[in-house]
Each structure stands twice: as structure tokens, then as C-alpha cells.
Amino acid sequence: MDNDKKHVIPREQYRRKRHEYFHNEEREERLEREREQRERLAKKEQEQAKVNEERVKDNMRKARIEKLTQEEIHQQQHLAKLRSDNESDQELNDTNTHHLTLPEEQQLKNEHKENNDKVTKPTDEMEKQEKEDNNSASSKHDEIEPKYSRVEKNKGKQKQDNINKSEVNHLDKSEQTKKHKETKESSEDVLETNKSQKIEQKEQKASSNETSNKELNSYTKDKNNKVEDNQDLKKASSQNLAHSNKLEENEHLENEPKNNDTMDKVKDFLKLHWLKIVIVVAIILIVILISAIISTMNQNSSIEQSSNNDTKYTTTMKNAETAVKSVVTIENDTPKNITTQTIDKTNINSNNEVGSGVVYKAVDDTFFILTNTHIVGSNKRVNITYDDDKTATATVVGRDMWSDIAVLKATIKNKNMQPIKIGHSKHLKLGESILVVGNPLGNDFKNTVTKGIISGLNRAVPVDFDKDNKNDEWVNTFQIDASVNPGNSGGAVVNRVGELVGLVSLKINMPNIEGMGFAIPIDAAREIAEELEKKGEIQYPNTGIGIKNVSDLMPYERNLLKVPEDVQNGIVVEKLKENGLGKKSGLKIGDVVVELDSKSIQNNLQYRQIIFNHRQDLKTLSAKIYREGKSQEIRIKLK
């Protein structure tokens, strides 16, 4: 090719690729689903056709069997009838032949021959040949023997039997042909109905019809053979039946004396052992009576148990009536403002003037009353109301702010006043039933009794005693759900046997909170009361330090004191009293105390609680502190 000429591809050689259209996957999936659905439907139709074909075959078999059985029954009945007729005819012939003369016997033979000729005409060729042979044989015997002998009589009997047999065979064959025709007609009717119902499955039905016809023909042939065999067996069966009937009669006759023997044996047994039988029946009756008595006793015990439950309630009422006689109303000289100490940053009894008290001890006419410190306040004398609006003046024997326990003493000459029975709070159980007796809202609702349970044990509740909006100490209490209202403070908490187990002191008074009251355990209250009776006050150890909570420190204060970052709880020493126990123990300002007496300290309330718990033994306590960011151990003295 020349370089100057432009290279051009002829158009007939230029074959542009055909544009490939977008491959529609959804359409192919839809077509595939439709194809699979058609295949499933075709498969179901084939299965249904097979099922229908099997049903048709079963119905045809059942129809054939029913028809053949019915025909066989009719045939057997007919054969039995013919046999009975033949036997009766033979008996008549036997009787007649003995009384007939020789000419009469010859005439009877001729009649039998004519009857044989008439019967054998409609039979088959094989039967004709057999009869011709029999006739020829009989004729030969007739020529040899004399005509009027006993042999001729026997031959006549044999001929009559042969005639009857030929009749029976002829009837059997005619009935068999009828059966075959009827079975064919029934099968054709069934096939026609099936063809009308299943036009789409002609080929399958045709094949099924052919097989069914073959089966039917084979079955009919077998049945015909069986019928011929049964004819021979029926003779033997009839003989067996007669024999069996005779045996049954004999057995029945033998069993009658046996039954009589058993009845006699039963009667003899009853005569011999009647006493034992009576004893056994009596024992059974006694057992039944005992079981009935036990069941009634169980019912009575259940009734008694329910009545015991009622008596428990009655005991509760008695306990309430008894406790009411030991509870008094306490009023101090300050203006009336009926409240109750609370824990919601406001006090239940802000002015501390009206509440309740419990008489726990009596010496002659002198009664000792247990109440709360926040009711008595700083007064030395208070007014009490008891019985039916009777009043008296009580002297304050002692008070303890930290435990909220005060003891009063009053001289009262009244037989209705009596000290309450004291129990033990260490035996209290969660969920135990209790009664609260007090004077809510003063004398207007005095001797009010409410019922509840112990909702919690060992509750440490923070309380503000000096009204500076700062909690001063944790008070050890147990929680109750009985109704506690202003004026119930100092009231009695009574257990189910009427014993004093606590002294009402606090309640939570916050929105959406109900039924959370707290009582001081009687064991702790009684210990404080005994000490107040002796000394008039409670002396607590004082370490002589001013403290602040670590959680209240500002970030710059933590940096100045070099408090480690992982220390979030504890107390910081802010002040030290000259010659105080804290300074003598080696504490310095800025020390951070995190452990005391092997217990972690959360705040100043817990520090004070641990110190106060050792008010009697005053032992030296080990402490862990941080000083300048370094931890060390020291020992704090309490005396």
C-alpha cells in the first residue's frame, strides 16, 4: 500500500458490534419462578392422578371382593339346599324300593333314564361323554346281572346320585358364568365413570383398566377353582359340624355336674370359714371409721388454727391496750408548734415542744419516762398528760443530744399508770410485725395506735441537732413502715408480745416519700437511760480538732494540702486545740485522715461515730493519714 494514500476499511469488512441491551435480571428471576411454579403444579397433578388411580383400583378390588363373597354365599346356600333335597329323595327311594314289585322297579328305572337324558342335554360335551361311558358301563352290568336283583336297586341309587351331581355341577357352572358376566359389567361401569371424570388422563386410565381387567380375570379363574375345591371340602365340613355338635352336647352334659360341684364347694367353704369372713369385714369397717375420724380431726385442727389466727389479732389488741397505759404526752413551756423531727434538711420538731414518752420504770409512786432530747429541749421541767387528761410536772433527769435520748421523772399516784414491758432489739427480724403507740398532734389524738412491720435494720440516719443546716451525727436506728406523724416522737414501738423494742425518733418528710419512719433500738436507749439516771449526762471523748470533709475541698485547697488524686473521702484537720488529745497524738493542721480503727472514713459524721463508740473503753485507735502527700500511720488517744 502506498504511503500517500489513505487507508480505508471497506464497509463490507467493517463490522460494528451489536449493542448489548440491559440485562434484565428481575425478568429472568420472575420467569424462573413461574417455570418452577408450573413444574410444581404439574408434579402435584401427577401425584394426584396417581393417588386417584390407586383409589379407583382399591374401590374396584373392594367391589369385586364384596360381589364374589355375596355370590359365594348364595351358591353355598343353594348347594346345601340341593344336597338336603337329594338326601331326602334318596331316603324316599330307599324306602320305596323295598316295598315295590319287580315291574314297578323296572318302571322307575326307565323314568330315571329319561330324567338323566333331559338333564345331560344342556351340559357340556365332556359331561356327555362321561355320562355315555357311565351308561354303557351300567348297560353291560345290566346284561350280566339279572334285572330284578338287589344289584339293580343299588345301581338305581348310584344313577340317582350321578343325576344329582350333574345337576349341581351344571348349576355351579351356570352361576360361575353369571358371576363372570356381572363382574365384567361392574368393572365396565366403574371404568366409564372414571373416564368421564378424568378426560386428561385417558392413557393412564386405559393402562390401569387393562391391568385391572387382567387382575379381575385371573382372580375369577382362581375363584372358580376355589369354588370347585370348596365343594369337596363342604361335604367333609358338614360331617365335621355334625361331629362337633355331638361333642358340644357331650361337653355340656359333662360341664353341668362340674358347675354343680363348684357351687357345692363354695357353700362348703362359707360354712367352714364364715367366722373368718365376718372378722375381715369388721376390720375393714373399723379402718374406714378410723380414717373418717382422722379426717374430722384434721378439719377441726384447721378450724382451731384459723381461730388461733383470730387470737393472734386479739393478742395484738391486748398489747395495744396495755401499751397505751404506759405512753404519755410531753409538753415543754415553749409556745406550741406540734412537729416531728425530719431528715429532709428541715427538722421534724423545730421548736421541740410536743411529743410522746414511755414509762419504762417505776419506784413506788415515782415513774421514769423515756423520750427524745429534741422534745425536751433545754428545759429542766416539762408537763406531762396521762390517763384521762390528767396532768403532772416531770423533772428532766438527763438528756443526750448525740443519741437523742432524754429521761424524765414524775411522781404520780394513779393505779392505771404502769411501766411497759421491755424487750430486746437485738432479736428483731426483718418483716416482724410491730405497733406504734403515740400522741400525734398532741392531746387531741392521744393514744393513737398504728400497725406495721420492721422495714429495715441498722439504719444510720444523719441528723442536724443544733439547727445550723449541717448534719451533726449519724443516729443508729431501725426502719418501720407504720404511720408516724408530728407528735409521735418519743412514742413506743411494741413487738407482737407487747414488749418495748424501740423509741420513735425520726421520719423522712420529703415529696413522693411515704412510710419511712425510724426508731432508736431499745438496747441502746436503755443503756443511755441507765447512764443518765446515774450521771445526768453522757461523756463522749473529744480529740480537740476542727475537721472538714475531703469531698468539700476546692481544687486549689487539694493542691495546697497535696492530697493524692485517688483520695476522695476522709477528713482534713483544720484546727488543733492546745493540749488536746489530737495534738498530743501527733496530728497537725493539714493532715488528711482516711482510716480510723481499721475502718475507712467517709466524712466527719463517720469519724465522730467511731470516736463515740469507744466512749466507755477510751482505747487508743490506729489511724492512717496523708501528710504533705505521703501516707503514714499514727495512734490517736481518747484519754
Swiss-Prot record:
It comes from the Bacteria. One of its GO terms (biological process) is proteolysis. GO terms for cellular component: plasma membrane. The chain crosses the membrane at residues 277-297. The keyword Oxidoreductase does not apply. Its EC number is 3.4.21.-. It is a single-pass membrane protein. Residues 206-219 have a biased composition (Polar residues). Residues 1-13, 21-75, 106-187, 195-205, 220-235, 245-262 have a biased composition (Basic and acidic residues). Belongs to the peptidase S1C family. This is Serine protease HtrA-like.
